[in-house]
Amino acid sequence: MLYGFSGVILQGAIVTLELALSSVVLAVLIGLVGAGAKLSQNRVTGLIFEGYTTLIRGVPDLVLMLLIFYGLQIALNVVTDSLGIDQIDIDPMVAGIITLGFIYGAYFTETFRGAFMAVPKGHIEAATAFGFTHGQTFRRIMFPAMMRYALPGIGNNWQVILKATALVSLLGLEDVVKATQLAGKSTWEPFYFAVVCGLIYLVFTTVSNGVLLLLERRYSVGVKRADL
């Protein structure tokens, strides 16, 4: 059915999942830091992240990906030349994680910023009244409450990152897109394997929707839903 390319395509699918999961972890970390910076009283860090999110949202993802990838490679070459050592090529997987994480960290910044702002101030005041430290207030009050508001945005960002992994094949990563392209060229069946690639991504997104639904139910425990 896959003309002997099932192993290659399976390996490519695993690489795609690894890339997506690693990228979303980096993006979430950047998003939490960025949201904290934009909500803090420090104007300098707030302006830095404001410029960062504005830049990312104003430039196409593919252009940013190429700029970051080649920019990192050029910077690394300058460092290796100055140290008199051999040139080091950036691994496509590492490059993909950094570029996707950096790009979508801006979107997570806005997602988390809005979610933190939606947490009722009364919750924080109550935690302070009970003698909670800042760390305890964040872990036990703010983060669980924020997640209920952030999950829809997190789900959307995850789906976009998952589909954006297809762009990383342009950097030389042997993901599911590259694997199906190879199979299509080798068998003279490019359309067939393009459909296979699309179906694999559809499976990924369908499973993701199920996981996100479970998470939304988990963080909505105790919250009354309006009856329509």
Curated annotation (Swiss-Prot):
The keyword DNA damage does not apply. One of its GO terms (biological process) is amino acid transport. It is found in: Cell inner membrane. Residues 1-12, 80-87, 174-194 are periplasmic. It is a multi-pass membrane protein. Residues 13-212 form the ABC transmembrane type-1 domain. GO terms for molecular function: transmembrane transporter activity. GO terms for cellular component: ATP-binding cassette (ABC) transporter complex; plasma membrane. Its main location: membrane. The HisPMQJ complex is composed of two ATP-binding proteins (HisP), two transmembrane proteins (HisM and HisQ) and a solute-binding protein (HisJ). The HisPMQ-ArgT complex is composed of two ATP-binding proteins (HisP), two transmembrane proteins (HisM and HisQ) and a solute-binding protein (ArgT). Belongs to the binding-protein-dependent transport system permease family. HisMQ subfamily. Part of the ABC transporter complex HisPMQJ involved in histidine transport. Is also part of the ABC transporter complex HisPMQ-ArgT involved in lysine/arginine/ornithine transport. Probably responsible for the translocation of the substrate across the membrane. Required to relay the ATPase-inducing signal from the solute-binding protein to HisP. This is Histidine/lysine/arginine/ornithine transport system permease protein HisQ. It comes from Salmonella typhimurium (strain LT2 / SGSC1412 / ATCC 700720).
